[in-house]
Amino acid sequence: MTKNNEAGWNLDHSYTTLPQSFYTEIPPTPVSSPELVKLNHSLAISLGFNPEELKKEAEIAIFAGNALPEGAHPLAQAYAGHQFGHFNMLGDGRALLIGEQMTPSGKRFDIQLKGSGPTPYSRRGDGRAALGPMLREYIISEAMYALDIPTTRSLAVVTTGEPTYRETKLPGAILTRVASSHIRVGTFQYAAARGSIEDLQSLADYTIKRHYPEIEAHENRYTALLQEVIKKQASLIAKWQLVGFIHGVMNTDNITISGETIDYGPCAFMDNYDQGTVFSSIDTQGRYAYGNQPYMAAWDLARLAESLIPILHEDEEEVLKIAQDEISKFSVQYEKQWFLGMKKKLGLFSNEEQDQSLIEQLLKMMEKFKADYTNTFRSLTLNTIENTALFESPEFKEWYKLWQSRLERQEESKENAYEMMKNNNPSIIPRNHRVEEALEAAVTNGDYSVMEKLLEALSNPYAYATEQEEYCVPPVPTNRPYRTFCGT
């Protein structure tokens, strides 16, 4: 069943120009009684949709997979992945790409239904999703967007009227995810594992045309592709670290070629600064701990380089050298981006030799005194040194003098320094206890007002507005560590 186009659907399906081994065409599985519980108005408008039309029953049916919009071409994408270091052939086990929306400005975005039913890649899964994890992805992805961190986004969440069974019976839901594309490091691993150089080349050419058209005429365009992805990921991971975001499941199937954050299953934001922070219940070894994220990104990108080896160069020795040289650039690029970001967080415009030491000393003290990561930088930005173990310590007072004298030595005024800090230190993040509170109200009581208030506050994290202050309060200390789950 195909619906008409008053809502503004303008779908293309360029992914189907790839060899058919990369996808399986399959319709979504209908649900019994869909209900729209969240629509992203501003995102809808930017994509060329009419939000009021999207609220109508006929369009809600599309978000539920009960109907298809004009021009839809539903398919599940195939890919592989190293999951916690172990290689598997995978694919969209509970999601369908229904098409690529062409926006009024000529941009192309994947429209994917997540939780739309089983596919040939489901393995033993039911292809469905629960309401809590889908609302969680909506909240966190929109918070990331407001923090100016490249991310997939959420257009809508519908409940299905059907239960989903995990450890317990949960209300089912479908999320409409929007992405620049869903091409992953794992997509290239999939092509390489199948052994067809032609397919691998087709994927690389398609990816370049879609994401990096400026390198199409490059003499060594596949090396240039690797360079671009490394650059994008170095920038992305630096941005994660600078706001204390912990992804939780940095498997190669969750590393996008576009440089967007994808898959918000077991992610969370750090409260107390600790390099070893882990939230994911399945990351028992701390593989994807906060401090490990840059190293794991480099590891994942090395898997991309391995996958590209058949098309990087004909000479075996030369190709290994190219791959190793490019991967070694990741840490340099990451460190540069992170250091620049940290300098902005401390209001440092100019360069001085001891800047690195100044930053490291602060972080060391924050870890020692278990200081709240976001609120420490917030207090420095507001120049309100509160009564905390960190700020009361003699070593911090000594550091504070050094920092103040460093600010005084630069040409820019202190006012300008504090303004730059304000633009780089969010006063509000999606605190784990606040997210849980919003999900509990929505899922258990059908009360979405708590989530709406939270989303409103998170939409402007650099505002330092008085009405946001209740969301700046860290959780009450507890002996029970906060744990996240992938929701699959």
Swiss-Prot record:
Residues annotated for ATP binding in this entry: G91, G93, R94, K114, D126, G127, R177, R184, D263
Reaction(s) the record says it catalyses: L-seryl-[protein] + ATP = 3-O-(5'-adenylyl)-L-seryl-[protein] + diphosphate; L-threonyl-[protein] + ATP = 3-O-(5'-adenylyl)-L-threonyl-[protein] + diphosphate; L-tyrosyl-[protein] + ATP = O-(5'-adenylyl)-L-tyrosyl-[protein] + diphosphate; L-histidyl-[protein] + UTP = N(tele)-(5'-uridylyl)-L-histidyl-[protein] + diphosphate
Pfam families: SelO (PF02696)
Active site: D253 (proton acceptor)
Top-level enzyme category: transferase
Annotated residues for binding of Mg(2+): N254, D263
Segments of this protein annotated with the region Disordered: 108-127
GO molecular function, one term: ATP binding
Stated family: Belongs to the SELO family.
Protein function: Nucleotidyltransferase involved in the post-translational modification of proteins. It can catalyze the addition of adenosine monophosphate (AMP) or uridine monophosphate (UMP) to a protein, resulting in modifications known as AMPylation and UMPylation.
Protein name, as recorded: Protein nucleotidyltransferase YdiU
Organism encoding this protein: Bacillus anthracis
